[in-house]
Amino acid sequence: GEPALFGAALLAGHCAGDLQEGPRHAALDARWRRQALAHVGPADWQRGLEECPRLAEGWSQAMAIWQAGQRSDTCDAWAPRFKAALTALGFPGERALDSVAYQVMGALGDLLAEFTALAPAAGRLDGRAAVRLL
């Protein structure tokens, strides 16, 4: 993936360890920038997670959820997997929800409900296609 995208996600927080490991998340982003990585591969990501145990645990759980289901499924099956994977990652973060975050969570719930309703029309999708459609 793109280092800038990974870095932005790490700096935004909203994940497991965002309060306690926030400085480590920022240091990882800074290291990738200093190294001028063109791509963060799975090995780079796994090495980075070694410094962030709470995020590493969440990542491991999210990947297990993602991989536990069928490779091709309908929107109504993908939606709970998306939600469970995000929850495993610690979304929406460790901070108390403010008004804006509460509204974002409501909008995400609405989006997942709309996505679920697409099941009859969309048919079976692999994970990438499901994410794109979402």
Task: List each language-model region with its residue ranges.
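Polyanion-engaging groove/track-forming segments
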Residues: 1-134
